[in-house]
Amino acid sequence: MLTTMSASSNTNSLIEKEIDDEDMLSPIKSNNLVVRVNQDTDDNLQALFDSVLNPGDAKRPLQLPLRMRKLPNSFFTPPAPSHSRANSADSTYDAGSQSSINIGNKASIVQQPDGQSPIAAIPQLQIQPSPQHSRLAIHHSRARSSPASLQQNYNVRARSDAAAANNPNANPSSQQQPAGPTFPENSAQEFPSGAPASSAIDLDAMNTCMSQDIPMSMQTVHKKQRSYDVISPIQLNRQLGALPPGWEQAKTNDGQIYYLNHTTKSTQWEDPRIQYRQQQQILMAERIKQNDVLQTTKQTTTSTIANNLGPLPDGWEQAVTESGDLYFINHIDRTTSWNDPRMQSGLSVLDCPDNLVSSLQIEDNLCSNLFNDAQAIVNPPSSHKPDDLEWYKIN
């Protein structure tokens, strides 16, 4: 019996030892990483793209129609025609368009037959008649929400004051308003008493209606901005330079620049530097025009003289400089000359353009030589010259 118990105890100890050995080896086995590769990854990704690109091929569960869902009645009511994304303040300015529509607060209950549960009827719309005054169309777009539209309010108030001054039979309350184009403190004062303050009236339409009774001399055509450009003095000095002596630059209360001439004790809107530049441009244009006329006259005179003298000698060539002066080239001697080779007398000193003789002097010499040649042709010298002075007087 003892032998059996000892054998069983030895067996149990061996089993426990083996278990302990496995526990000691377990951390070593955990270092072995297992890599699993899913071969269907590309197919699954392609299936996702196909479900988006081809929605008809994908199997979608059936959805409940909108009418069968528990949605409020306002979900199926279309918006008002004047309510759009283009309006810059739909909830504020468009509230006046719905002011004439009132919804009944009390919902009528309809009793169903056969003991069914009562159903609340849809509230009916009660449309009230429009007010007596005719309302203008509302066209408040985003383009008019800029600060430049403040000038339109400025013009509207100015025209209303002018109309009240021209019409003595108008409402006295409107004539008690202070004259001058001031902005209203409350926007509700600009609208009729029957219309809500939140309703927006088209400013352009109001300007058109009011301008029909105002003369053309009082109408303002330039609405949205000033008719002058506000430029800093530093920028003007950089572009145009300093002011001439005796001039000073100043500004009005509105910021418009004007100029004072302390010499003549006068003021003007135009910049004297711009006026000086314009005068310089005019003078330059006149000088260029005069030079063109002079060059044309030179070329015409030179061509006329050349045609009367006949062709050039052999080896000579006629050319013109960049400034329009005429000179001659001798290809035989390889020299240049201002003198016409067809006229050999009186110009031997001016044989080279390096002498820098002005073209006007050359033309004067040419004209004097031509005049002498013409006189010799018309009045040939007589071989017998009498000593009597009367002959010289007659001839």
Curated annotation (Swiss-Prot):
Modified residues (Phosphoserine): S82, S88, S100, S117, S145, S146, S149, S227, S232
PTM section of the record: Its activity is regulated by multiple phosphorylation events. Phosphorylation at Ser-88, Ser-145 and Ser-227 negatively regulate its activity and restrict its nuclear localization. Wts-mediated phosphorylation at Ser-145 promotes interaction with 14-3-3epsilon and 14-3-3zeta. Phosphorylation at Ser-88 and Ser-227 regulate nuclear localization and activity independent of 14-3-3 association. Phosphorylation at Ser-146 by Cdk7 promotes its stability by preventing ubiquitination by the DCX(DCAF12) complex.
Comp. bias intervals (Low complexity): 162-179
Gene Ontology biological process terms in this record: apical protein localization; border follicle cell migration; cell competition in a multicellular organism; cell fate specification; cell population proliferation; epidermal cell fate specification; heart morphogenesis; hippo signaling
Keywords: Activator, Cytoplasm, Nucleus, Phosphoprotein, Proto-oncogene, Repeat, Transcription, Transcription regulation, Ubl conjugation
Keyword field contains Cytoplasm: yes
Signal peptide stretch: none
Effect of S88A: Increased activity and nuclear localization and decreased sensitivity to Hpo/Wts-mediated inhibition
GO MF terms, alphabetically ordered: 14-3-3 protein binding; DNA-binding transcription factor binding; kinase binding; transcription coactivator activity
InterPro entries xrefs: TEADIR3_omega_loop, WW_dom, WW_dom_sf, YAP1
Compositional bias per record (Polar residues), positions renumbered to this chain: 84-100
CDD domains named in the record: WW
PROSITE patterns in the record: WW_DOMAIN_1, WW_DOMAIN_2
GO cellular component, one term: cell-cell junction
PTM-bearing positions, type Phosphotyrosine: Y228
Subcellular location: Cytoplasm; Nucleus
Coarse class of the protein's main subcellular location: cytoplasm
Domain WW span(s) in chain numbering: 241-274, 310-343
Similarity comment: family membership: Belongs to the YAP1 family.
Oligomeric form and interacting partners: Interacts (via WW domains) with wts. Interacts (via N-terminus) with sd (via C-terminus) and this interaction enhances the transcriptional activity of sd. The phosphorylated form interacts with 14-3-3epsilon and 14-3-3zeta. Interacts with Ack and ex.
Function: Transcriptional coactivator which is the critical downstream regulatory target in the Hippo/SWH (Sav/Wts/Hpo) signaling pathway that plays a pivotal role in organ size control and tumor suppression by restricting proliferation and promoting apoptosis. The core of this pathway is composed of a kinase cascade wherein Hippo (Hpo), in complex with its regulatory protein Salvador (Sav), phosphorylates and activates Warts (Wts) in complex with its regulatory protein Mats, which in turn phosphorylates and inactivates the Yorkie (Yki) oncoprotein.
More details: Named for its loss-of-function phenotype after a very small breed of dog, the Yorkshire Terrier.
The protein, known as: Transcriptional coactivator yorkie
Organism: Drosophila melanogaster
Lineage summary: Eukaryota, Metazoa, Ecdysozoa, Arthropoda, Hexapoda
Underlying gene: yki
